[in-house]
């Protein structure tokens, strides 16, 4: 049987904004102790698949581009509109996509100055998607964590440090064993200052790496809160009932399990 080897594009143009983003060597220094994993390896979560055979092949290899779903124009307009939720007084929002949102949320829960975290879906073309919808790979959504933070106690730079250390931003549409556009790397900003800081950080990080970063930097779009089951998943114990600390400043390794 002959196997067709397809050389994937370096990046999916539709998935990226202006400059690409980057990361320091320290960001890739993950613990090797088991059962700790830097990004989800065995999450038991559905892998995104596309409907056409060729797209399915690319997606399984982790090189797919954003899916082209047939969405109602009015639905897409809402989904691609700005996040109209309002943070608490004196607080700011930021959204981050860095693979499976369970572990990413716990990492941000531990940051002093972060006052609230929620996991959800954004940057898709379907209004009110479910987890199952997103996992088909046809809605365009990314799994994200929306962070509410007090800028007097927590800088946007410190949130970016967590972002870089939590995942590998040089892998397109995948983190570890999780494959699909819903696991893509992304920074979604709410202010011009956040955008500036993110782009400057990317330029600095990219100078250190020997791989090109594929993180997208885009304005935050409408945030769809994920089902309650997914909220604070690891802090609640997950499927295995093994709770992990969300205490501020906690340095315990984050164990990934579904």
UniProtKB/Swiss-Prot annotation:
The reaction(s) annotated as catalysed by this protein in its Swiss-Prot or TrEMBL entry are: L-methionyl-[protein] + [thioredoxin]-disulfide + H2O = L-methionyl-(S)-S-oxide-[protein] + [thioredoxin]-dithiol; [thioredoxin]-disulfide + L-methionine + H2O = L-methionine (S)-S-oxide + [thioredoxin]-dithiol
UniProt keyword Transit peptide, yes or no: yes
Give the start-end ranges of region Disordered.
Answer: 62-89
What subcellular locations does the record give? Plastid, Chloroplast stroma
| EC number(s) recorded for this UniProt protein | 1.8.4.11
User: Positions modified as Phosphoserine?
Assistant: 245
Task: Kindly give the Gene3D superfamilies that the UniProt entry links to this protein.
Answer: Peptide methionine sulphoxide reductase MsrA
Outline where the chain's transit peptide begins and ends.
1-53
Identify this protein by name.
Answer: Peptide methionine sulfoxide reductase A4, chloroplastic
Q: Which organism is it from?
A: Arabidopsis thaliana (Mouse-ear cress)
Gene name of the record: MSR4
